[in-house]
Amino acid sequence: MKKRKFANAAVMLILLSVVGYAFFGSPVEMYRRGELRKAMAAVEDGEVTLNEIVPFAWDSVYSFGPYTTQEQMEEIMGISARRLEESPSEGMVQLVFVNGGQIVCGVCGYISKEGYSVSFDEKINFADNVVFRAKRDADGILWLTEPHD
């Protein structure tokens, strides 16, 4: 009887995990998004690189504009991106961090909710150590703009 209860509990736990993953995505990615949001919240006005900010390993980051389809993202990145979503409107941040050919963090959310916006053309490599201008607006939103040398 105890074995059956244990087996039922194990099956239920596995099912809940699968359903949770299907609806909410990877808990590791969720954790990384939260850590990235915290790191962005700590950035002060001035010059900064993503290498200094991003709190997890990455070798390239992609930025996609609104309405970019999953298929277009996959073609640009050259990898399968099953969990990526199209940004449904203007005013959203859409970043995909890749490490070793695997997506390690995807951000698709309203700038006002994420608390930051990062503006660059399509792709940045970690090795490039691109410098951004960091500026907070009156609402406390961090704007990382215009990479420059």
Placement of each model-derived feature along the sequence:
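Short, structured surface segments that line ligand/substrate-binding pockets
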Residues: 85, 89-107
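Exposed boundary/loop context
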Residues: 10-13, 94
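C-terminal partner/receptor-binding element of secreted or periplasmic proteins
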Residues: 114-149
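A short acidic/small-residue loop/turn micro-motif
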Residues: 108-113
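N-terminal export/targeting and maturation segments
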Residues: 3-9, 16-84
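Extracytoplasmic
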Residues: 56-58, 89-92, 127
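Short, low-complexity, polar/charged sequence segments that are solvent-exposed and flexible
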Residues: 80-84, 101, 115-116
